């Protein structure tokens, strides 16, 4: 097999789909899922081609974010990364205690998390932490896709 061809994986609670492709681009996704994921929330690693895929909405994968943030903490001793991780853990804990009925009403804890995130995204990061600055810029662009699962599937 060509070493440049890699496996691409899509997974749900019921099935795993594996495709082989040279890239992770939109064409690869469209070749395998012409209609996108119109009845699903697409959870992914923030790759641009995934955002171009049709779905109910998108959710940035928390595990991917935490892995990056752990690296920033270890490599840069970044207090910004630590604060971002704390917000993610608060969101995870909030999701655990919410019932389906809770999503029909305003959730003050979620609003507080979004406010904390907004302040954190405005916080200046030292320029020598280039990767952390890039991460902050990416999250600022896609912040609306961070807490989707604490909103319920309909957003």
Where are these regions (language model features)?
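Catalytic center-proximal scaffold of phosphoryl-transfer enzymes
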Residues: 1-155
């Amino acid at each position: 097999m060509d070493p440049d061809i890699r496996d691409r994986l899509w997974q749900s609670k019921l099935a795993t789909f594996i495709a082989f492709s040279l890239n992770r681009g939109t064409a690869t996704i469209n070749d395998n899922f012409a209609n996108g994921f119109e009845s699903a929330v697409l959870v992914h690693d923030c790759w641009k081609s995934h955002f171009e895929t049709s779905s109910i909405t998108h959710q940035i994968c928390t595990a991917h974010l935490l892995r990056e943030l752990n690296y920033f903490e270890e490599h840069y001793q970044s207090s910004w990364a630590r604060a971002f991780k704390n917000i993610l853990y608060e969101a995870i804990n909030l999701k655990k205690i919410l019932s389906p009925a809770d999503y029909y009403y305003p959730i003050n804890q979620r609003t507080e998390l979004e406010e904390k995130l907004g302040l954190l995204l405005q916080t200046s990061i030292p320029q020598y932490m280039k990767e952390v600055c890039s991460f902050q810029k990416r999250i600022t662009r896609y912040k609306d896709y961070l807490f989707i699962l604490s909103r319920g599937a309909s957003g």
